[in-house]
C-alpha cells in the first residue's frame, strides 16, 4: 500500500493496491486483488469484494456493498446504503458484476443489479433498483429505475434550487 490507512478495524485481502491520498474509514473490508485509485474516500462499514477496481477520486460513503468483480470509474459518487450486486441467478457460479462509468452518481439506498452498466455522468435517484443499462448523462429513478430526464435538465433544476435557497438564507 502506498499510504497509511485511516480508521480502525480495516481488513484487506492479498494483493490489494491502494493509491495515494486514499482515505479509508472504520470497519471496512477490501477483498483480494482489489485496486483503489488515488484520492478515493471510502466511508465506514463498507464491504468491497475481490477483484474490484475503483477509479480515482471516488467517494464511496458508509454502508456500501460492492460485490466481487465490479468496475467503478473515476470521480464516481456512491451514497450510503447502496449495493452493487454480481449474481444474476443466485447461487450461480457465473458472476456478472455491474460497471459504473466515470462521473456517475448513485443515490442513497440504491441497488444496482448484475450485468448492468451505469453510463458516464448518469445520476441514479435514491432508493432506486437499477435493472437495466442506464444511458450516459441521464437521470433515472424508481423501482425499476427508468430515465426521467437528461443531465442538462437536472443541472438546470439543481441550479435553480440552489439559487432559491441562497435567497432564503439572506
Language-model features, listed with the residues they occupy:
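Glycine-rich adenosyl-nucleotide cofactor-binding module
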Residues: 3
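Short, structured secondary-structure boundary patches
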Residues: 107, 154, 168-170
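Conserved catalytic-core motifs of eukaryotic protein kinase domains, centered on the activation segment
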Residues: 88-90, 116, 150-152
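Conserved beta-strand-loop-alpha-helix hinge in the C-terminal portion
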Residues: 136-160
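Acidic/histidine-enriched, glycine/proline-rich intrinsically disordered or flexible terminal extensions
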Residues: 158-170
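Left-handed beta-helix
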Residues: 7-8, 13-14, 19-20, 25-26, ...
Amino acid at each position: 500500500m502506498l499510504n497509511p490507512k485511516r480508521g480502525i478495524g480495516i481488513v484487506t485481502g492479498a494483493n490489494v493496491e491502494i493509491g495515494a491520498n486514499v482515505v479509508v474509514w472504520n470497519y471496512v473490508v477490501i477483498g483480494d486483488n482489489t485496486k483503489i485509485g488515488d484520492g478515493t474516500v471510502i466511508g465506514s462499514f463498507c464491504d468491497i469484494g475481490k477483484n474490484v477496481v475503483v477509479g480515482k477520486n471516488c467517494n464511496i460513503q458508509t454502508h456500501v456493498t460492492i460485490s466481487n468483480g465490479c468496475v467503478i470509474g473515476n470521480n464516481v459518487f456512491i451514497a450510503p446504503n447502496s449495493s452493487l450486486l454480481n449474481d444474476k441467478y443466485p447461487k450461480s457460479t457465473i458472476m456478472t458484476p455491474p460497471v459504473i462509468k466515470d462521473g456517475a452518481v448513485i443515490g442513497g439506498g440504491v441497488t444496482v443489479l448484475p450485468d448492468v452498466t451505469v453510463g458516464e455522468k448518469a445520476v441514479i435517484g435514491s432508493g432506486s433498483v437499477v435493472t437495466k443499462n442506464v444511458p450516459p448523462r441521464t437521470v433515472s429513478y424508481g423501482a425499476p429505475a427508468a430515465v426521467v430526464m437528461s443531465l442538462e435538465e437536472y443541472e438546470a433544476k439543481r441550479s435553480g434550487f440552489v439559487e432559491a435557497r441562497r435567497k432564503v438564507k439572506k
